[in-house]
Regions:
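Terminal accessory/targeting
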Residues: 1-65, 77-80, 84-110, 211-330
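A general structural signal for short secondary-structure junctions and capping/turn motifs
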Residues: 2-3, 195-198
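Metal-dependent polysaccharide deacetylase catalytic core of the NodB/CE4 family, i.e.
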Residues: 7-23, 42, 63-67, 75-177, ...
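Acidic, His- and aromatic-enriched active-site or binding-groove loops in soluble protein domains
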Residues: 71, 186-195
Length: 330
């Protein structure tokens, strides 16, 4: 299938369920149930991680849009509220687990017994989310590898095997981190930048739409389900880690041919509490250069690009950079 004709896979990322004190990482159960109904109403099918793996490795074509459901951190509220619904409805999902809190028997997290229940269900697949769930980008390589290996030992002890799929803590990754994840044998790795997965996507920079109390509202969730991929041939810079000496970075993207209305692309970026438009210019029919104006003052820098493919469907590309020299509190 030609890249511009792919409808792709919408990755949804959840954390907490009905923990209303944490709106940025929580989804209300009423909203979650409504979201599942909306997915069914729009006649979208869920995809298992095994089928998704085949798709991004080029072993399977998808002729209709699919939805991949993922959950990060193994909060107890997932097991208490969402797991019974997913089990009843037979919805496949991936549960990414950071093992330190599980080992410590933190009451806010699931237990190893509960994780084994999901692992053995044939429905939920357990993913790797590091040991500490710390701000890892910027660590020395030995320390980074030791953290991941410690979690791998926990998985081997408790589940009998090491997960094949990885989720970067806080969605942060650098070229070095990505290469370490590859070297350790993982098949896929997910970030927290928004966007639709197409078959050309880097298998170690896979996007997901974070769903929370804001993005979980019906109108915004419907918009997410109506998005299409924005496939590209080349993306520069290859490293998503930004040094204080190259802040802000210049971006250059070569999109695939055939993207209708690409000339209408608009990109915005987070600058404090606002999302100003990023100046851009076409250097060829399908190649765009983005020149953010102001240096980023936050550790996590985001750029979102979109344009209308039809009155109801937008193409969407989310980008996340990490500035490890800036405190995570900013």
């Amino acid at each position: 299938m030609e890249p511009h004709r792919e409808q792709g896979v919408i990755g949804l990322m959840y954390h907490k369920f009905d923990e209303n004190k944490y709106p940025s990482t929580n989804v209300r159960m009423k909203d979650f149930k409504d979201q599942l109904k909306m997915i069914r109403k729009m006649k979208l099918d869920f995809i298992s991680i095994e089928e998704f793996d085949d798709y991004v490795h080029g072993h399977r074509e998808l002729y209709n849009k699919r939805v991949l459901l993922t959950v990060d951190d193994a909060w107890a509220s997932f097991y208490r509220h969402a797991w019974p619904i997913l089990k009843k409805e037979g919805i496949p999902f991936v549960l990414f687990i950071n093992t330190r809190e599980i080992n410590q028997k933190n009451k806010n997290y699931m237990s190893w017994a509960q994780i084994r229940e999901i692992h053995e269900s044939g429905l939920g697949v357990i993913g790797h989310h590091s040991y500490s769930h710390d701000y890892i980008v910027g660590w020395e390589e030995n320390r980074l590898r030791a953290d991941l290996e410690r979690a791998s030992q926990d998985f081997r002890r408790e589940l009998g095997s090491i997960p094949e799929y990885f989720s970067y803590p806080f969605g942060e990754y650098s070229l070095e981190f990505k290469n370490i994840v590859k070297d350790m044998g993982f098949r896929l790795a997910f970030g927290q930048h928004s966007g639709v997965v197409d078959s050309r996507k880097d298998r170690f920079e896979l996007p997901r739409f974070p769903i929370n109390e804001n993005w979980g509202k019906a109108d915004r969730f419907e918009m997410v389900l109506n998005t299409l991929p924005m496939p590209y041939k080349e993306f520069l810079p290859a490293d998503k880690k930004v040094s204080e000496f190259k802040n802000p970075p210049q971006l250059e993207i070569e999109f695939v041919p055939g993207l209708k209305n690409l000339k209408n692309i608009v990109c915005t970026t987070n600058d404090g509490d606002s999302w100003p438009t990023v100046p851009l210019r076409f250097v060829s029919e399908n190649r765009v250069v983005l020149d953010p104006i102001n240096p980023y003052r936050v550790r996590t820098a985001r750029i979102n690009c979109s344009f209308a493919d039809s009155p109801k469907h937008f193409r969407w590309l989310g980008i996340q950079f990490v500035l490890p020299h800036i405190s995570a509190d900013k």
